[in-house]
């Protein structure tokens, strides 16, 4: 390694070591898991995508998103956020911080969660295109959401039930690949 590149590389390595496990994707290295935390950041439970599919009732939303065309709807399936949060025993908190795999953070008010019932979508309905591309086989009705489609977990809200003022002002509530739900006062 050349001497003029050694110092910047060492400085970066030291900065990452000092920042610790909360810096970058290393803090939550698996986008296929969701960690539920109390307000101090202590993990209460870790759920896999498979557990989100099998341990909670599934809700289906046929909805658009802030990024789809006005006439384009996608059918998503997954558990209600309020059902997942109730499992923590912290359902009475005022807010929930959602941390995404890319370190994006969104703050949700509990009244929003109760009023609009977002889901943590883990699947989307198979389409003709999915079948022709081999992403769905036989009578398969739903398939996993890919990273390119904002998965493997995507916080989906019933777009048509949201107040008009939420778009675009609250687009941050549609969290791509959330990995942590943290209680917040």
Language model: regions and residue ranges:
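Bacterial N-terminal signal peptides that target proteins for export
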Residues: 1-11
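N-terminal twin-arginine translocation
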Residues: 2-3, 19-24
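Bacterial N-terminal signal peptides
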Residues: 9-20
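N-terminal intrinsically disordered, low-complexity segments enriched in P/E/S/T
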Residues: 24-185
